[in-house]
Amino acid sequence: DFNEVAEADWVVEAVVERIDIKHNIYNKIQTTRKNNSIISSNTSTIPLKILSANMSDEMKKNFCITHFFNPVRYMALLEIVTEEFNDIEKINLLKQFCDEKLGKGVIICNDTPGFIGNRIGVYAMQVAMTEAFKMKISIEEADAVFGRPMGIPKTGIFGLYDLIGIDLMADVLKSFIKELPKEDPFHEVAQEIPLVTKLIETGYTGRKGKGGFYRMNKSDGKKVLEAINLETGEYHPSQKINLGFGDKIDINKLIQRKDKYGEYAKSILTKVIRYAAYLIPDVSSKYIDIDDA
């Protein structure tokens, strides 16, 4: 209802991630909004400069990206992406409102691919996956390490891939490969993995497909969770991995271990921390913003 747009102080666009559809919406908003109202997009992938390309100067300075993380009710992080053309006073007002009224942890990001959260998050996921292949870590072992011990959902890395969709993650990687400069270390962990390509081609795209790195099968009439062998591509009954920490897992003790679990954890953390430092000042001028994200 564009009559409501005419009265609103802040309009948030959250339509499908297609630039043609978004531009069409912005054209309609531009003819109905009141001057000085704030307009923002909830995009997680499209650069601000592209989104605002057809806007008037007045609308452009009041337009930004407000990237809410899902589920919005429970995830505190909010990335506000700005450009040089933005009205800084308006951005600060929006940040204050989202902090005080919406209870969000607001981070101001530069207009770069993936912003902060997804740029580092996807890199970390790719590191965890590629290191598992390289170090011959099973997917159950990888998920036990790159899961709760590192503040990741209990799905772990491979379970998270299945949840998101292996094919969707492949599209995300293609987007990063296209947008990021060739010297960016992201490219080192974004190369095509034959097993992943085969899973997608055969319909094993994750939970929404026939299965993925994990799948449900039946044995003697009972459902059995199976895990894929990264070397052979064959499935076997999933094994429960005990890291030997009990209820409380100390990440410092984990990375100091001399076994394969400790080496795997240390390898991931080292690469992710180095990459995060590499991104300053490209994604943000403040190290604390990366820590907060």
Residue spans of the language-model regions?
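N-terminal glycine-rich phosphate-binding loop for ADP-containing cofactors
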Residues: 1-293
